[in-house]
From Swiss-Prot:
Summary of the function given for this chain in its UniProt record: Transfers the gamma-phosphate of ATP to the 4'-position of a tetraacyldisaccharide 1-phosphate intermediate (termed DS-1-P) to form tetraacyldisaccharide 1,4'-bis-phosphate (lipid IVA).
Positions annotated to bind ATP: T67, L68, G69, G70, T71, G72, K73, T74
Pathway in which the depicted protein is active: Glycolipid biosynthesis; lipid IV(A) biosynthesis; lipid IV(A) from (3R)-3-hydroxytetradecanoyl-[acyl-carrier-protein] and UDP-N-acetyl-alpha-D-glucosamine: step 6/6
InterPro entries: LpxK (IPR003758), P-loop_NTPase (IPR027417)
UniProt cross-references to Gene3D superfamilies, sorted A to Z: P-loop containing nucleotide triphosphate hydrolases (3.40.50.300)
Biological classification of the source: Bacteria, Pseudomonadati, Thermodesulfobacteriota, Desulfuromonadia, Geobacterales
Native source organism of the sequence: Geobacter sp. (strain M21)
Biological processes annotated in GO: lipid A biosynthetic process; lipopolysaccharide core region biosynthetic process
Protein name in the entry: Tetraacyldisaccharide 4'-kinase
GO cellular component terms, A-Z: plasma membrane
Catalysed conversion reaction: a lipid A disaccharide + ATP = a lipid IVA + ADP + H(+)
The entry's keywords: ATP-binding, Kinase, Lipid A biosynthesis, Lipid biosynthesis, Lipid metabolism, Nucleotide-binding, Transferase
Family: Belongs to the LpxK family.
Length: 375
């Protein structure tokens, strides 16, 4: 399966030039046409009210993207949640719970004080958010409206954050944030299955704010064609902490040491590159599929590679770390890199959030058959 995924990725990136490859790519591009058309009709159906969408009685902030792979949604959600909690608000994240055994089912993952469901059931990202942001409530469910209703009944939040919500048009939002990777905002600019776009580029019109992620401080993305408010952010790796608990470690403390890194995230190469930019000497790396459910086979592979590479230290991501607790004794010392989001244009997003909180008044809970016009 991994080899097949790699092949299609090479096709989309133009790294395969044989006649069979060109034929396969032509087939993918042909298949993308009805897919893109269906997505346009779907969006039009929600916008016109033909397909019903529902509104929660508290403000909803959606954070999402239009491309496959990681654009930094989790650190962005964590930043927004921390900001709102700092303003004294009770915040609940609504997530699907990708990768968990209960994916799509209604679950209260965190009540803001306690983690009630583990990553095996709830998925890695909901549990990571619950642990990373003190006071954050997290609810999972395929139907985010129903998840929001459950949160209202049990947790009484003041505001919702819809995680990975750009395509979840069934739930109306009051602020629609679209994340674009500064390095390659629209991938190869083709829709699935011929490219990385989850829907046509025109979907950007639904966004209230475009947030470019993984920018460099000196970078200036081309914003003129967007005709949308936009701001920039960058990801910072701020040292690491032992998985087993203990004092944090600066990356400079690893200078000159043989290290290996492993990760099961959407963009493992970006994580490995980030470590090397911080001066970590990576002698080997191991990439698993996104949302990997770690078991004995995966842990054995990590340990074999550590031994073969004679690595003194192992480093992984926060997202992986939430799933490694059962294997701490086998793994020994593993360092967890701390990833934070730095907003280069923070006042613009803060102003939008503050305006939403000021204007956001409680609304009556609408019945599910209501079809309002704003999606």
């Amino acid at each position: 399966m991994a080899d097949l995924e790699s092949y299609f990725k090479d096709l989309m990136d133009g790294k395969r030039a044989g006649w069979k490859d060109r034929l396969a790519l032509a087939g993918l591009r042909l298949a993308s046409l009805p897919y893109a058309l269906a997505l346009r009709f779907r969006a039009l159906g929600y916008a016109s009210g033909i397909i019903p969408s529902h509104r929660l009685p508290r403000p909803v902030i959606s954070v999402g993207n239009v491309t496959l792979g990681g654009t930094g949604k989790t650190p962005t959600v964590a930043w927004i949640a921390s900001y709102l909690i700092g303003r004294g608000k009770r915040v609940a994240v609504l997530s699907r719970g990708y990768g968990g055994s209960a994916e799509g089912r209604l679950r209260i993952v965190s009540d803001g004080n306690n983690l009630l469901v583990g990553p095996e059931e709830a998925g890695d990202e909901p549990c990571l958010l619950a642990r990373k942001v003190p006071g954050l409530m997290v609810v999972t469910g395929a139907d985010r409206y129903r998840a929001g209703v459950l949160a209202l009944k049990k947790l009484n939040p003041d505001v919702f954050i819809l995680d990975d919500g750009f395509q979840h048009l069934k739930l109306k939002r009051d602020l629609n944030l679209l994340l674009l990777d500064c390095r390659r905002p629209f991938g190869n600019e083709r829709v699935l299955p011929a490219g990385y776009l989850r829907e046509p580029k025109g979907a950007i019109e639904r966004a209230d704010l475009v947030l470019f992620t993984r920018c460099q401080p000196e970078s200036a993305p081309q914003l003129a064609d967007l005709a949308k408010p936009a701001c920039r952010s960058l990801h910072r790796l701020n040292g690491c902490v032992p998985l087993q608990g203990g004092e944090p470690l600066a990356f400079s403390d690893l200078k000159g040491e043989r290290c290996m890194a492993f990760a099961g995230i959407a963009d493992p190469a970006g994580f490995f590159d980030g470590l090397e930019k911080e001066g970590v000497q990576l002698v080997t790396t191991l990439a698993f599929s996104d949302h990997i459910c770690y078991g004995d086979a995966e842990i054995a592979a990590v340990l074999r590679l550590k031994k073969a590479s004679r690595s003194a230290f192992m480093v992984t991501t926060e997202k992986d770390a939430v799933k490694l607790a059962p294997f701490m004794d086998q793994l020994g010392t593993v360092y967890v890199a701390q990833l934070d989001l730095e907003l280069l244009d923070a006042p613009l997003l803060q102003e939008m959030l503050d305006r939403l909180l000021t204007a956001g008044k409680a609304r009556p809970l609408q019945p599910e058959n209501d079809g309002n016009k704003r999606a």
